[in-house]
Every structure is written in C-alpha cells, then in structure tokens.
Amino acid sequence: MKENEKRALELKIKLDDIFKQYDERTKYILSHPELIEKVNYRKKSDNSLVDKNGIKKPICKDGILLRGKCEYKGDHWTRNSNGHEIVDYLNSLFRVLVATKDSNEEAEETLDTTNLGVEWDIKTETLRSNKSEEICINRTFAKNYISIICIFMLYQSHSENEILEVLADIDKCWSIWNNAPIARINLKKQPGNGSINDSRLSSYISLYGEILQKQIELINPTVIINSAGKPGMNFFKKIYKDLECIDKNYGNGRDKWIYIDKIKKLVIIDIYHFSYRGWGLNDQSLFKELIHRLIYTSMDINKLLM
C-alpha cells in the first residue's frame, strides 16, 4: 500500500470513530434534561434530539465528499464513492472545508427519510433536486454553494469576467464543484429542519463542540469557508487563537470576510449563508465582492499556503 493510501485509510478509520463519539455524546445529553433544554424548540414539550415517537434522531454524517457515480434511487439522489476521495483531498493544493449550519435537505415531519442518504450523510450530496430524476439544481442554497466554491477554485487562474461567465452557467459550475476534492460539515449536527437561529445553533455547538473540533482537526483544512454565520465564526475563533483579518482595509473597511492564522497556515472566508438570496442578484454584486476580496488578499493567501 502506498504511503498516501495508508494515510487515507488511517484518516477514514479516525473519522468513522468520530461519529461513534457523536452518538455517545447524544446519549449523554438525552440522559441530562438540563442539556436537552439548551436545544429545545420554544415549546417546553418538544425535544429537537428525538422524533415525535421518542426515538433518538441520527447524527448528521458529513466530512470529505464522495466523488463517484450519482444515482437516482426512485425518490432521491445519492452518490457512491470513487474509492480515492480522501487521497485526493489530502493531495489537493487547497484542502477546502465548507462549514454550514444546516443540512441541504429539509424533511417533512411525516416523511420516511430512512433512505434519504443526502439527508443523513452530507458526504453523498449531489445538490440535485430530489423531486425529479432530471438533473436539476434549482435551490438557492445549492446554486450559491456551487458558485462560491467555483469562485475560490478559479480566482487565481481566471479573470473576473471569465469567472462571472462560468457563474452564469450552472452546469459548468456544478461540473467544477462535482469534481472538487472538498469537505463539508454541518455545525448543527442534526439533519432536517433546514433553518436554525443563531442562539440555538450556538447551543448545539456548545454541546458538540469538543467533538466538532476533533473532526475539524482530523480533516485538517487549509481553507475554511464559513457559511454558518456568527456562531460558526465564534467557534472558529476559539479553535484558532491567532486569526487576523487581512481584508479589513478593503473598500469601506466595515465588512471583514477573510482571516488567516499564520501559525496553523489556515485561511477562513467568512461569508453570507448560502441561502441568502442576495447572492443571486442580477448584478452579481456579492459574487463580485468575494472575487475582489480574494484578489485583494491573494498575495497573503499565496504566501501562507503555496
């Protein structure tokens, strides 16, 4: 076995063990009512960690995305492994981790989601609509997620106009995302209920934070794209103590998007949530803003990571 394959196998075993730790943590939380209260809905009788029958909800699996064949299983899209995703991720120029605050599918209370792999395991996501066997990417979350990955993958080798031309063609965008060796984690750690407020997300992070940190350290990204808002950024600032903003003097100086940790050799891009409709404005102003900020800071990023 080659050295990089050995490293990949060791990493897979450790990442698989992480989800056993998540399950054990959930069992512990469920046995302590004062902890359950932290993530409850507004109604005292509700418990967001169990379903209406009192059965513990599964932890949302996530990590390095699968890059094998996409398949439609009759009522949902899923994805197989090509057998070398972890090797490709470890060998990639930039190890990109996308941090989101919710899964990309929202389940109805009455829907049997047992087989919805994309619901429970983000690694199998295709970003195609589960409502049709047609290859259809029509959700705001998916389009913006794909587009932002494309911007990061292209900004060093393409002009602004060339990137905007790619962004105008969702099929080209999907093709780039489809082959990109990237990882995604869901900071909420529970699937379904596709939106969550900041205070509740912060509660989830406080309950699962120690294991989340272990998972992130194993994935060992060089770039984190934070789409989990303030709770996500606060969490990363606790993990990475030496973060400094490198675009604070860009434009009006009010917004801060790009941070680096010189000790950890890490870049964090703190952007709007992928479901924010402002990303889809006709003038593509927010996409342009991200491109400009990446170009503005490219010397610092290259010096850190190249």
Model-derived regions: residue spans:
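Glycine-rich anion-binding loop/nest that anchors nucleotide
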Residues: 100, 222-231
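Hydrophobic beta-strand segments of well-ordered beta-sheets in folded domains
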Residues: 96, 222-224, 267
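A polyanion-binding, active-site-adjacent surface
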Residues: 2-219
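C-terminal capping/extension of enzyme domains
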Residues: 2-17, 198-213, 233-306
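Residue-level marker of positions within ordered structural domains that often coincide
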Residues: 104, 149, 229, 262, ...
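Short acidic, S/G/P-rich loop/turn micro-motifs used as interaction or catalytic elements
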Residues: 105-106, 191, 231-232, 275-278
